[in-house]
């Protein structure tokens, strides 16, 4: 209410004045605090959603998977028990589970899609749909059954959808995303932190994601899923420059999460794992200095999780590597190398070694490694294990193929195949199985019915 209007109204009866002021104080502009906005623009939401995806892929879940897949090793603090006896609880990854839904998760993704739809912006909607598929795939891969179909509505206790149903829905979602990405509109290129507005790159990434989902269903549905994975990967990421990566800079709150952790007081708690280091050393792989720092002997070595008896002088830190020395390092999330190795695995399973060799050797040639004329499945999966360092997908590959060969931590019969649901979900949603119904060593997700042999 303008000051001149107040002065002009001074002679009005008190009741009328009170009514006018009441209406003013209840108006939208009065109750909205400009420092605490009640709505966000599509662009603001879209940037937040991308940041949340980066956090999911680089955060605590990625670190424990790096341990359990023995690319990394925990030698101090909580990491010793997380790796040595697989000691985790429902509280260990509560924030990670909640990130699927809030803070840039499903609720905000759905809002981006809704606002983009209302604006006739099919391209932004398609990008959000790809991110929705990534987000929910992250959840389904790790926890199996989870809330999805009812999770973004008004139901505060949504049902848990079966994992295989979620995968099927995500395949449909990605088909819709690809169609929308061929439509009109699009974000400001600066707001697309991943591809700068390139719909071609988003479409290729969507096809690689579809190939991933088909791979994740192989163990349950059979080798026919390899045919589908092959077809999708043939349309997937077509060159290394088009990798789907996180975006970071040197600002304290915007650094790569691995770099943040390694430069913290806990950085030395997580070091190199022997399986990965030994594999790379045997192949003369030039990425060793990008992945790990030198050990006290000025060489590269990893901690052996099975024996738990590696000398300190033989262990390489992760700190001091090319990745952790760069606060702005863009973490590879979906890559050309992965896509080529999906083609290699699917071709091997469907046709044989000769069909797989060109795809495997394309990746090996990138790093100056000799071609393998007649590769085995182990050759393919070992190469992918190297390529996907610090990537959650390594766990999915291992659960499907049991490669590379690795043994559980000492005194344990199997490597776990899932995590506990978040504690908050367990406490607030009665549909959540309790922790005592989620034995890490006997309960498997639907797509992974059998544990790998010890």
Which residues make up each language-model segment?
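Bacterial N-terminal signal peptides that target proteins for export
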Residues: 1-10
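Bilobed periplasmic-binding protein-like "clamshell/Venus-flytrap" ligand-binding domains
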Residues: 60, 386-400
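Cyclophilin-type peptidyl-prolyl cis-trans isomerase
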Residues: 376-390
């Amino acid at each position: 209410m303008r000051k001149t209007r107040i002065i002009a109204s001074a002679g009005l009866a008190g009741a009328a004045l009170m009514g006018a002021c009441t209406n003013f104080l209840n108006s939208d502009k009065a109750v909205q605090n400009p420092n605490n906005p009640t709505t966000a623009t599509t662009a603001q939401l879209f940037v937040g959603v991308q940041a949340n995806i980066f956090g999911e892929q680089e955060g605590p879940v990625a670190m424990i998977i790096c341990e359990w897949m023995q690319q990394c090793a925990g030698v101090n603090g909580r990491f010793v028990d997380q790796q040595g006896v697989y000691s985790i609880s429902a509280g260990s990854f509560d924030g990670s589970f909640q990130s699927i839904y809030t803070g840039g998760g499903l609720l905000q993704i759905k809002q981006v899609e809704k606002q983009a739809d209302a604006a006739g912006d099919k391209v932004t909607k398609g990008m959000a749909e790809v991110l929705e598929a990534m987000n929910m795939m992250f959840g389904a891969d790790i926890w199996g059954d989870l809330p999805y179909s009812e999770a973004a509505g008004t139901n505060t206790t949504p049902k848990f959808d079966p994992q295989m149903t979620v995968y099927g829905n995500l395949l449909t979602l990605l088909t819709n995303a690809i169609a929308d990405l061929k439509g009109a509109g699009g974000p400001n290129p600066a707001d697309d932190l991943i591809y700068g507005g390139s719909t071609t790159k988003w479409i290729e990434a969507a096809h690689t994601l579809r190939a991933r989902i088909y791979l994740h269903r192989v163990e349950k549905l059979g080798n026919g899923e390899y045919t589908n994975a092959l077809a999708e990967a043939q349309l997937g990421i077509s060159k290394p420059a088009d990798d789907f990566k996180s975006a970071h800079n040197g600002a304290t709150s915007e650094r790569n999460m691995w770099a943040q952790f390694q430069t913290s007081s806990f950085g030395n708690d997580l070091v190199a794992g022997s399986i990965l280091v030994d594999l790379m050393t045997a192949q003369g792989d030039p990425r060793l200095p990008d992945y790990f720092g030198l050990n006290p002997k000025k060489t590269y070595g990893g901690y052996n999780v099975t024996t738990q008896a590696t000398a300190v002088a033989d262990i390489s830190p992760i700190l001091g590597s090319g990745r952790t020395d760069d606060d702005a390092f863009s973490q590879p999330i979906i890559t050309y190398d992965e896509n080529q190795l999906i083609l290699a695995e699917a071709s091997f399973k469907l046709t044989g070694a000769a069909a797989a060799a060109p795809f495997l050797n394309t990746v090996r040639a990138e790093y100056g490694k000799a071609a393998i004329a007649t590769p085995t499945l182990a050759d393919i999966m070992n190469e992918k294990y190297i390529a996907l360092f610090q990537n959650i997908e390594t766990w999915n590959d291992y659960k499907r193929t049991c490669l590379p060969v690795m043994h559980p931590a000492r005194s344990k019969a199997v490597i776990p195949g899932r995590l506990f649901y978040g504690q908050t979900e367990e406490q607030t949603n009665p549909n959540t199985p309790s922790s005592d119904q989620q034995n890490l060593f006997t309960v498997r997700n639907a797509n992974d019915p059998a544990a790998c042999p010890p």
